A protein has these predicted regions:
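RNase H-like, Mg2+-dependent phosphodiesterase core
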Residues: 1-211
């Protein structure tokens, strides 16, 4: 079973993770989750918690179901998006950190975190708030795993809703197989770039070798 907290005591810890960092197209998305300590769990928490895992280890259907439970049970949660134009203008490190900031800002409870638990090696200076970078944290700490699910499902949902919002968007998606690859650089996506060139929501720095 994953750990629910990093430190002892009553520190407010927020788990943070991202999805879409390596995509060719579309935004990077971050999730942020504050999960209650184990001593506060009801039976409902005990049923849901074993299902919260690194998002990559869950099927799409399972991720969506668990995402709903996380949103219902978390003390607080938020999602932050940074689009492709911002990534091209400011670079991926900035974009990744900005997605983290936006996810934290989207939390609505008003609680001020004492500690950020961040998956990976990229820190996030935020004044007096401490942070811990934890490689593989989405497989070790429950709040990070929950954040990884929110980020993955949130980004996939954003792509699907964008595609289905107009016939023009559906035509764009068909060129690059976006509904299936969600913007990642699959073989079909690369073939689409060679055949049609770039779309306005492609990340220029990511695709230059495929044009």
């Amino acid at each position: 079973m994953m750990k629910t907290t990093y430190s002892l005591g009553e520190a407010i810890e927020i788990g943070i993770d991202e999805a879409g960092r390596g995509c060719f197209w579309g935004p990077i998305c971050a999730g942020a989750v504050i999960w209650p300590p184990e001593e506060e769990w009801t039976e409902e928490y005990r049923e849901v918690t074993p299902q919260i895992k690194d998002s990559k280890k869950l099927s799409e259907k399972k991720r969506v179901a668990v995402e709903s439970a996380i949103k219902a049970l978390a003390i607080d949660w938020g999602i932050g998006l940074v689009d492709a134009s911002e990534i091209d203008e400011n670079g991926m490190t900035w974009a990744n950190q900005e997605a983290f900031r936006r996810a934290i800002a989207a939390c609505s409870s008003g609680l001020e975190p004492d500690l950020l638990l961040i998956d990976g090696v990229l820190g996030l200076p935020m004044g007096d708030v401490k942070y811990e970078c934890i490689p593989g944290g989405d497989g070790l700490y429950l709040p990070i795993a929950a954040a990884s699910i929110l980020a993955k499902v949130g980004r996939d949902r954003w792509v699907t809703e964008w595609v289905n919002s107009s016939d023009k968007h559906k035509e764009v998606a068909a060129r690059y197989d976006l509904l299936n690859n969600k913007g990642y650089g699959t073989a079909k996506h690369r073939d689409g770039l060679k055949a049609h060139g770039a779309h306005g929501m492609h990340r220029g720095q990511f695709i230059r070798n495929w044009l």
